[in-house]
């Protein structure tokens, strides 16, 4: 019998110490990685609940195990809430990740060797959209599109490639593209060649839920998202559709094809996050995320840096570091010393290797969750520029670090 009185610190002090150190790091550093965010205490409570003990293969009302009457309630809450959030008729909340959600979509209607048309990883796409190193690029014949000379998504190229290659599926969505994507234009192109349209909205889902970015669901055959990033939920995935045409194929593609039992404690945490995203205050959050990202981009341009695509219309943007004569790898390290966390990221036509890069990716979702406003975002952008202008000067890094500490103390991740 387990005792409820035994704490993790008592039983496993080594692990507890590592968790405490990570908790302190999150408090002391400003998080600018676009794919990261902070979840509420309610989300963490759900994910740390006794639901982790329950196996529940199948779907609500159709389980292969007994004792599922309460986890059925949990999963149905998550399904109903996410459908309401995005105006979908179908939802599957079981994918363990966005990548697995994407795999399930492909497997539901494609056969190995079928052609897919997705955004190039080098131009801001995602590994799972047909990159050669990913299963999507190994199992299917992947053709890629990119940005035009102005670093705007090249819809003319998408149409030309679609007409030339006749893909069975067109994939839209990105992991490092700052501007709004025209879902209606993609629908028009897909219809011209009789292709399925699949949108991966993982990065933009929170903005879409908050009404600050166009909703792809009405235009698409399939939509996937992660539940973290801008949506501020636990790490996981979701599949959505505007109707129930592919319900049977998608459900079987997740279980039993790709996964076994769902993670009921994570699904519970998803349900909490969906409820949070349905509240009026989430709309204010999404609006502030965009304001903060735009403010940071503007300040960095004033400091001599170049923003890929010229601006941002979302939570994310890429910074071209070539004018500063510094690589993304070096910038990430220097900013880290100043307690600013970013990730190195390739820019279009990047001359550097993927593990070095000529850019960094910046996102405003996590800092906005802490409470940073537009004025704070502008201060922060100038601190980033201070580091990049003199990345090897320890006194400079120390000065920035002190100012970051003051900002972080002003906006704790978790208040009283």
Swiss-Prot record:
Q: Where is this site: Plays an important role in substrate specificity?
A: 228
Gene Ontology MF: a single term? glycine hydroxymethyltransferase activity
Q: Name one GO cellular component term.
A: cytosol
Q: Which residues bind (6S)-5,6,7,8-tetrahydrofolate?
A: 121, 125-127
Q: Which reaction does it catalyse?
A: (6R)-5,10-methylene-5,6,7,8-tetrahydrofolate + glycine + H2O = (6S)-5,6,7,8-tetrahydrofolate + L-serine
Pathway listed for it is: One-carbon metabolism; tetrahydrofolate interconversion; Amino-acid biosynthesis; glycine biosynthesis; glycine from L-serine: step 1/1
Cofactor field: pyridoxal 5'-phosphate
| Class of enzymatic activity (EC top level) | transferase
- Where does the record say this protein resides? Cytoplasm
Write out the function statement from the record: Catalyzes the reversible interconversion of serine and glycine with tetrahydrofolate (THF) serving as the one-carbon carrier. This reaction serves as the major source of one-carbon groups required for the biosynthesis of purines, thymidylate, methionine, and other important biomolecules. Also exhibits THF-independent aldolase activity toward beta-hydroxyamino acids, producing glycine and aldehydes, via a retro-aldol mechanism.
Subunit arrangement? Homodimer.
Homology family: Belongs to the SHMT family.
Protein name, as recorded = Serine hydroxymethyltransferase
Organism, per UniProt?
Neisseria meningitidis serogroup C / serotype 2a (strain ATCC 700532 / DSM 15464 / FAM18)
Q: What is the lineage of its organism?
A: Bacteria, Pseudomonadati, Pseudomonadota, Betaproteobacteria, Neisseriales
